[in-house]
Every structure is written in structure tokens, then in C-alpha cells.
A protein has these predicted regions:
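WD40/WD-repeat beta-propeller blade N-cap
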Residues: 6-13, 50-56, 92-100, 136-142
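Conserved strand-to-loop turn within each blade of WD40 beta-propeller repeats
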Residues: 29-32, 71-74, 115-118, 157-160
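Solenoidal tandem-repeat scaffolds enriched in leucines and small polar residues
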Residues: 1-58
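Loop/turn-rich, solvent-exposed surfaces of beta-rich toroidal or solenoidal domains
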Residues: 97-123
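Blade-level signature of beta-propeller repeat domains, shared across WD40, Kelch, NHL, RCC1
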Residues: 143-168
């Protein structure tokens, strides 16, 4: 049974993420370079987050639901405050620039993992806004990042058919 249909009428939706703390809230991002926060009960947009210059490829909520991160075609990962709508942080990997295709927080939110279409994964310290390391994560475009429920692992999956599980 369909509960609601959300339609911003602004391009293709490439990613979505449900709030970890509010069962009525979800985010969508895509080719419009916008992120919309929705209320599923009303099928209405609660807030629109701007500032991206290209497709929004992936989203992940901060573990307490107070913020979220985006991975964008312009190589940037951005963190936004859900309540105020303000951009908290913009993270750009070192050259060569490539599309950010995946993003995931650690269970504490202190670390942010970002994947790229050049098979690289960056690990960021979200408090200092600094890159901690860059890892090789397969042989091709990274399609997805996810963390384990216990927070001990993050997995990366790519177009080469491989999934790599990393200890945090």
C-alpha cells in the first residue's frame, strides 16, 4: 500500500535517506543539485538545501539525525545542519578531482567515509574537517558505502563486482 508519493518535479532522484530518529522525515537528492527534506505524512517539502553545483549522488544522516552529509558529482562532500539548513562543512579530496559517489558516517559521527568514481575512499575527521587518509577501494567506480549496526565495520561496493569490508 502506498503511504505517500513525494514529487519535487525537479529532475531525477539519485539517492534517498530516512531519518534515524524521526519516522516521518526523509531526504532526497539528485540531478537538480538540491536536497529536499520531506514529511512523509503530508508529502510536502519541509526544507530545501542548496549550494551543490552538480548532481547529489549519495546521502547519509549523522547518527543522531541532527545533520547529514552529501556526496556530489563536483567531488565535494558537504555536511548540513537539519534544523537550520546551514552548511557546516565542505570537504574536497585532493587532485585529481573526481565525482563523489558514496558517503557514510561512522556510528559516532566523528568519521565520515566518502567514495569516488576513481575507486578511492577518503576518511574524514568531521570535528576538524580534515582528511585522515585515502584508501584504494577496488578497481573501479565506488557505488555504495554502508556501516555495520555495531559500528565496527564499513563496507564499500563498486562496479567491479567486489565488496570490501573495512575495520574502523
Amino acid at each position: 500500500q502506498v503511504v505517500s508519493t513525494l514529487d519535487a518535479k525537479q529532475g531525477d532522484v539519485l539517492c534517498l535517506q530516512m531519518s534515524p530518529t524521526d519516522p516521518h522525515t526523509l531526504l532526497t537528492g539528485g540531478t537538480s543539485a538540491l536536497v529536499h527534506m520531506w514529511d512523509k505524512r503530508t508529502a510536502g517539502i519541509v526544507r530545501t538545501f542548496e549550494g551543490h553545483r552538480a548532481d547529489v549522488n549519495a546521502l547519509d544522516f549523522f547518527p543522531d539525525g541532527s545533520a547529514f552529509a552529501t556526496a556530489c558529482e563536483d567531488s565535494l562532500c558537504r555536511l548540513f545542519d537539519v534544523r537550520t539548513g546551514s552548511e557546516l562543512l565542505s570537504l574536497d579530496r585532493p587532485p585529481p578531482r573526481s565525482a563523489a559517489t558514496a558517503v557514510a558516517f561512522s556510528s559516532s559521527g566523528r568519521l565520515l567515509f566518502s567514495g569516488y568514481d576513481t575507486h578511492k575512499m577518503c576518511v574524514w575527521d568531521t570535528l576538524r574537517g580534515e582528511r585522515i587518509s585515502t584508501l584504494n577501494a577496488g578497481n573501479t567506480h565506488m557505488a555504495y558505502l554502508g556501516r555495520s549496526p555495531d559500528g565496527r565495520f564499513v563496507a564499500s561496493a563498486g562496479w567491479d563486482g567486489k565488496t570490501i569490508v573495512w575495520g574502523i
